[in-house]
Amino acid sequence: MTYYAINGSPRKTHNTATILNKALEGVKAADPQAQTELIHLYSHDFSGCVSCFECKRLGGKSYGKCAVRDGLTSILERLADADGIIFGSPVYFHSITGKMRMFFERLLFQYFVYDADYSALSPKRMPTAFVYTMNVPYQVMLESHYTESFQSMESFIQRVFSKPETLYVNDTYQFSDYSKYKADR
């Protein structure tokens, strides 16, 4: 069994990465034989979907697979064989990071079929989870409708893989030394 965690944060050792590493430790505790890997998206040079539609061309060599070749190609290939994926992103302006958004465009769109059933070509269904880290108190997150803005991407993940379990990590630290910044918190 192989499980991946996808870090959509530019930071490799801060809030999101820390939570994802702990989640992978939990996977290993539940199944010591499991293979796990944390992938840092900001370590890879790639674009979002370029709208070439090669993944939609019936009978084409890339049907159901992203045809773009760049730093995301090998990651998409590995994820096709995964047994579970944990996504993680800090929240910037009520949303996931831009790099995470580009990743989802490529990961999810390749599997979408334009049919009345909203079917998907994903190689298999698998458990998924999404970790959102943010420097926002829980109550403010709810009152400001953050969760509603997250539901759109979660619905696309559900269409392709499964309904993701979610974890909201609130009131996170942004700096290790707040005395160096103007921040009232």
State each model region's role:
Residues 8, 41, 133-135, 169:
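Cofactor-binding loop segments of dinucleotide-utilizing enzymes, especially the Rossmann-like FAD-
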Residues 12, 45, 137, 173-175:
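Flexible, glycine-rich phosphate/dinucleotide-binding loops
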Residues 30, 148-185:
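Glycine-rich phosphate/pyrophosphate-binding loop and the adjoining helix
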Residues 112-165:
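Short, glycine-/small-residue-rich phosphate/pyrophosphate-handling segment
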Residues 1-89, 94-112, 185:
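N-terminal beta1-alpha1-beta2 submodule of the flavodoxin-like/Rossmannoid cofactor-binding fold
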Residues 101-107, 143-153, 183:
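Short, surface-exposed, charged loop/turn segments at secondary-structure junctions
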Residues 39-42, 71-77, 119-128, 163-170:
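Low-complexity, flexible helical/coil segments
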Residues 98-99, 139-144, 177-179:
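A short secondary-structure junction signal
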